[in-house]
Amino acid sequence: MCRIAGAPRTLLPLLAALLQASVEASGEIALCKTGFPEDVYSAVLSKDVHEGQPLLSVKFSNCNGKRKVQYESSEPADFKVDEDGMVYAVRSFPLSSEHSKFLIYAQDKETQEKWQVAVKLSLKPTLTEESVKESPEIEEIVFPRQLTKHNGYLQRQKRDWVIPPINLPENSRGPFPQELVRIRSDRDKNLSLRYSVTGPGADQPPTGIFIINPISGQLSVTKPLDRELIARFHLRAHAVDINGNQVENPIDIVINVIDMNDNRPEFLHQVWNGTVPEGSKPGTYVMTVTAIDADDPNALNGMLRYRILSQAPSTPSPNMFTINNETGDIITVAAGLDREKVQQYTLIIQATDMEGNPTYGLSNTATAIITVTDVNDNPPEFTAMTFYGEVPENRVDVIVANLTVTDKDQPHTQAWNAVYRISGGDPAGRFAIQTDPNSNDGLVTVVKPIDFETNRMFVLTVAAENQVPLAKGIQHPPQSTATVSVTVIDVNENPYFAPNPKIIRQEEGLHSGTMLTTFTAQDPDRYMQQNIRYTKLSDPANWLKIDPVNGQITTIAVLDRESPNVKNNIYNATFLASDNGIPPMSGTGTLQIYLLDINDNAPQVLPQEAETCETPDPNSINITALDYDIDPNAGPFAFDLPLSPGTIKRNWTITRLNGDFAQLNLKIKFLEAGIYEVPIIITDSGNPPKSNISILRVKVCQCDSNGDCTDVDRIVGAGLGTGAIIAILLCIIILLILVLMFVVWMKRRDKERQAKQLLIDPEDDVRDNILKYDEEGGGEEDQDYDLSQLQQPDTVEPDAIKPVGIRRLDERPIHAEPQYPVRSAAPHPGDIGDFINEGLKAADNDPTAPPYDSLLVFDYEGSGSTAGSLSSLNSSSSGGEQDYDYLNDWGPRFKKLAEMYGGGDD
């Protein structure tokens, strides 16, 4: 318990005892006590008090939570108390001693029980020289005394009193350090004590906020406090002697930081967005805006109130919305929200603390944007009462008409999108309406073909709706219904055959020129005078013809049921009907002729080839009949052997097994192996019956004990078919032709090779390749050549090695002669003679050829030549006057000359 200095000191021991009891009984649970928790509430105010100014707040402890109390002031003319305990000034007045104290009563409304508490108002001191000099009145806290034992037990007092907390306003301007309270022990009379405080704000972070004079025990604050940072400090005071021994138990000191209105409200968002459906009733919730205040929310400084400062636009009413001043809920208060007129509202919201007091409260603003959402309150309306369109007959998926509507709702929403339906005039469902998603128009489309000859015009009744129902209370106007007049345009249609296909039944075998039926087509265009002509489109067997005018179908060939063009007894022919309209149209029809069978096919033996043994046992031949007719013109069949030739019945016998099968056996004991043609008479069951002699080729062979043929090769050779023989002969002829062509080609190639040999350059041919020397002169007169040597140059034996002697400088060196490939035999000697004569003739007639036959003048080459002077050479002179034996030394190429001019008798 705190007291003012100068109060009766007799209360100090009691306070100390109570404090000691509270410290020792800290583990006990304090009992709740209904009433005011404080004995005195105090507030420090300025000199001038204004009307409506909040002064302080009192708290009432309602333990059971069920009491409803009502506050009253002992000075109702000056002060009033709100339901939450906030004390306001009723009028403006200067603070004086007569207003410094008054009482506040709390009365239970049900039990009428009453409680009271004192309120003390203090004037905020002004720093003058006198006030500085005067010692302020400082509260004093005394350590409780040590309790003595009574009857051997430590006495403990009830905890009816506790040390009240120290209330210190935030943002104090000082001067600092500012004294708060003095802590003292009763033992300071006998002992020299030292005081200290511990805890956050003293020796713990934030350190240095509170300090204590260790000798006097004066507790002071060193700087302004901020409640928004730390709202309460919990310190412990200690008292020790000069030796550091504890002389008092520590006491707790609680310092409450009194909130000051130093923070404005702050909205969580500067711009708030909300929506409300158009046409909403008053009282419809829209949105909630929220602001926070850093000041004490339990005090006036943190109690906010909201209000709407402005609304834009102000139509249809300037007060379309209101706001709950405590919760910030925005609701509608007026009707008439219409999105088609106003799509968005902008509200300026203000939040003010001090419970919205405009004089002392701090305020802030934010913007609330409310969008009016669309509802389906505008039905679609047609732009015209009647729409017109036309469509050619037999056309589908054609847009007939384009329906246009207007809808004031928000485009491309379910409340704007139109849905069209046909409510009348189309019982067969020939039309449908689709919605264009971009323009919202209705596209009337034909979904079923329309026949002009049946319906020439349609009058449709159409209605337009939205994808969602209309808002409550909205009705569809007459403009939501319209009519569509559709005109059908006549077009030239295809002629059609009826029935199609047309089926007729006729016997096969009808002769050419028989009229089968009339196959005509109908023209659906009854109102057009048109002619139809007929043509044949498909007739696989070319049996039919159709009259181009009347459509009569006549045969031009015999109808045959057994034809490959007949499937399942039905012959199909297709015909074309064309009109002369603009444009001309055509249609096809199919005629199906079901051909009835007649007995026009004789039966044949099956199989046509068989084999059996030379003796009747152990096998026989099973045969049946093949008849292209069907019942009853086919089986059962009758099998028999002809009377002629007589060998047939003498050698063979036939036995009927049933209506379809018979058995052929040898009648004699032995028949030589070979191939036999056995005629068999087969008769069907038609009316009249039809017979046929069919040949069965039977191969008779030697058989083993099992009845199997053993001379298969001979039978196979004897039984070779005509086609196989022809194929073999053709192959042989082709091979002979190929061999002959190859021989001719080889001979022609040899001739070409021989001709090329004759055209070879003389310098390249070994047979006449005479070496060139420095002896120059005319041609040789003697042209009596030995052609046999030219024809067979390879027969000439190589000459022996030339003996050592004088050699010409132009003589070929002696070395191994090159081996030339052996040429083919030379052609006829006459060919070579002709070739040489042609060469000579060409050389004589060529003016650019070397003058081999002309007189040439040569320089003298000096002596030493065995030939002497060139002028002495005369090829026409007698050879006997000269010695040509040296030619034998010139090698094999001059051997012939040596033989001709050498020392022989020739």
Swiss-Prot record:
Subunit structure: Homodimer (via extracellular region). Can also form heterodimers with other cadherins (via extracellular region). Dimerization occurs in trans, i.e. with a cadherin chain from another cell. Interacts with CDCP1. Interacts with PCDH8; this complex may also include TAOK2. The interaction with PCDH8 may lead to internalization through TAOK2/p38 MAPK pathway. Identified in a complex containing FGFR4, NCAM1, CDH2, PLCG1, FRS2, SRC, SHC1, GAP43 and CTTN. May interact with OBSCN (via protein kinase domain 2). Interacts with FBXO45.
Subcellular location: Cell membrane; Cell membrane, Sarcolemma; Cell junction; Cell surface
Gene: CDH2
Keyword tags: Calcium, Cell adhesion, Cell junction, Cell membrane, Cleavage on pair of basic residues, Glycoprotein, Membrane, Metal-binding, Phosphoprotein, Repeat, Signal, Transmembrane, Transmembrane helix
Described purpose of this protein according to its UniProt entry: Calcium-dependent cell adhesion protein; preferentially mediates homotypic cell-cell adhesion by dimerization with a CDH2 chain from another cell. Cadherins may thus contribute to the sorting of heterogeneous cell types. Acts as a regulator of neural stem cells quiescence by mediating anchorage of neural stem cells to ependymocytes in the adult subependymal zone: upon cleavage by MMP24, CDH2-mediated anchorage is affected, leading to modulate neural stem cell quiescence.
Keyword Metal-binding: yes
Chain residues that bind Ca(2+) 2: 170, 228, 259-260, 262, 295
Residues involved in Ca(2+) 3 binding: 261, 263, 293, 301, 353
Topological type in the membrane: Single-pass type I membrane protein
Taxonomic superkingdom: Eukaryota
Disulfide cysteine pairs (residue numbers): none
Extracellular side: 160-724
Name listed for the protein in its UniProt record: Cadherin-2
Ranges of biased composition (kind: Low complexity): 863-880
